[in-house]
Amino acid sequence: GKTAILDAIAVAFGTFVNSTGLARGSVFHRSDVQRIKVRETKTNEMEEVYPLVLEANGVINNEVTHWSRELHKPKGATTTKDTKPLIQYGQDIRKKVVQKVDEILPLISYYGTGRLWGLKKITLNKKQHETSRLSGYIDCLDPLSSYKSFESWYVDICLAELELKIEEIEKNNLDISNNEFTVIRKSIQQAVNHIVEKNTGWKDIVYKKRAETIVAQNETFGELSLMQLSDGIRNMIGLVADIAYRAVKLNPHLENAPKQTPGIVLIDEV
């Protein structure tokens, strides 16, 4: 069905994500393999049909490209040998980032039907706060990823913005309207507002220190923490915020990264 197609697209781009260095790309699993009945028995014997083959066509680095991935046995690995253009593209991106080239990195992310509010906990590695641009690819093809990584990062952004403003006040500098963290916060808010505000009235998500959580504003209902909102609104905010967060991480040099970043976003059942 539709989910199988999206899962296949995620596997198709798995080697690209893997080759960027910090993230793991999607692979085939044994459960993806077709099973058929080969004979009539009381035990309902089923056999798996190998190889499982995925062929894809796409435009990689402005060139039309064909590639494929295969799984040949139950405990085998998903092949990568026929995905060299994607691997090379990912490696080239990694080199340019290290060389401080302001290359616009493409966004790719996948949000599956199983995405639930706070379902996926931050791993120890994520709690260490990856600062690399390439961290925008971490868990990007995990259909369960959504909100937790964004939450941790966004809290840091809001606190850093506040800290810089306090430092400026202590220096008797009254011009505290904007700093680099203000720009990032506003770009995230604009992205979420663009999708969520018109339909729900909720807008301007920000971390409030006194509440110790991220809150949203509404002209009718006032200010509530995201955890107090309905599941539907929370999940929509989480999805849009995660996309915007990845865009900002990948392309911090862009003035409005969520709007200017090209790429592919897979959403199963909006």
Language-model regions: role of each:
Residues 1-151:
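P-loop NTPase switch/coupling surface
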Residues 268-270:
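Walker B catalytic acidic pair
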Residues 136-260, 264:
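Extended helical coiled-coil dimerization/tether regions that scaffold
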Residues 3, 264-265:
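Hydrophobic "anchor" residues on beta-strands that sit immediately upstream
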